[in-house]
Amino acid sequence: MSESYKNAGVDIEAGYEAVKRMKKHVERTKRIGAMGGLGGFGGMFDLSELPYKQPVLISGTDGVGTKLKLAFAMDKHDTIGIDAVAMCVNDVLAQGAEPLFFLDYLAVGKADPVKIEEIVKGVAEGCVQSGSALVGGETAEMPGLYTEDEYDIAGFSVGAAEKDGIVTGENISEGHLLIGLSSSGLHSNGFSLVRKVLLEDAGLNLDETYAPFERPLGEELLEPTKIYVKPVLEAVKSGKIAGMAHVTGGGFIENLPRMMPDGLGVEIDIGSWPVPPIFPFIQEKGGLKSEEMFNVFNMGIGFVLAVKEEDMTDVIQTLENNGEKAYLIGRVKAGSGVVFGGAGLS
């Protein structure tokens, strides 16, 4: 053991202990195609073991943003890894890809093996939910860059789709309907605004329970991002999905146009789905306009699929048969961007 390195803030032995603690969680993520074990220089995956004829690899990378600040404040680290996986695999899913494997990057101010295990346990849980093998990663101790209690996490997902089955949105046309899938809450976006409104301006306490919630505010805010992989892949198999969008940073206004061909926009029917209480709670505490809410948050819809009108019932049935709550939330119209109807904006 290097005492000089330890005195400089890097504890190699603690790093070794963290890796030992990770192994049982990584083992949970084994799937067909995964090769090798933890500790190699590169993660391996044998695509030939899967029944693809013309596979196209589709990748995505993302992080969790300032939701981490709440994990630090609550000293709760077992779900933030789920968020890291969800942000990546839901993006890959939006192209119709089956997530295959995942890598994580964890940078810490101080290597605490117990805390690192909690974080990686969450990553492994996200991988299990999405069917991804956790084939590798990096844990870097960076004293001076982060405080001892701080860390950052990012992930990288690789999935595959048949070449003729990639969902690009290019076949969306006027009259297609939009199916929205319920979110679990805030997911992993908008937390800088959340902290400003609820903690700085309103002075609320993360450890207290406020109406209408039945658990402390911090736990409500840390609810992990929903992973949509399994129900959506079942719907994709039908060949009836023309386009998909993962509703993340920028909310409806930024993300729905990303799946639209030029010359088309969407009309969203406000009131066509139940909005989780965390959103009106934030809106009321911050005096925020509805338009701003839809430009920052998912507002209760975390994933959107575009389908032909005649396919809507079958697709919703498939999603609900696989445990997902699905709602008809709007339609595709000539134009651009996102307009809101129904109950309107205030």
UniProtKB/Swiss-Prot annotation:
Q: Which Pfam families does this one have?
A: AIRS (PF00586), AIRS_C (PF02769)
Q: What is its EC number?
A: 6.3.3.1
Catalytic activity reported: 2-formamido-N(1)-(5-O-phospho-beta-D-ribosyl)acetamidine + ATP = 5-amino-1-(5-phospho-beta-D-ribosyl)imidazole + ADP + phosphate + H(+)
Q: Cite a GO CC annotation.
A: cytosol
First-listed, main subcellular location of the protein, grouped into a coarse class: cytoplasm
Ligase as a keyword of this entry, yes or no, is yes
Keywords associated with the record: ATP-binding, Cytoplasm, Ligase, Nucleotide-binding, Purine biosynthesis
> GO biological process annotations for this chain's record?
'de novo' IMP biosynthetic process; adenine biosynthetic process
Q: In which pathway does it act?
A: Purine metabolism; IMP biosynthesis via de novo pathway; 5-amino-1-(5-phospho-D-ribosyl)imidazole from N(2)-formyl-N(1)-(5-phospho-D-ribosyl)glycinamide: step 2/2
Annotated compartments:
Cytoplasm
Enzyme kind, highest EC tier: ligase
> Keyword Nucleotide-binding on this protein?
yes
Question: What's a single GO MF annotation on this record?
Answer: phosphoribosylamine-glycine ligase activity
- Of which family is this protein a member? Belongs to the AIR synthase family.
Q: What is this protein called?
A: Phosphoribosylformylglycinamidine cyclo-ligase
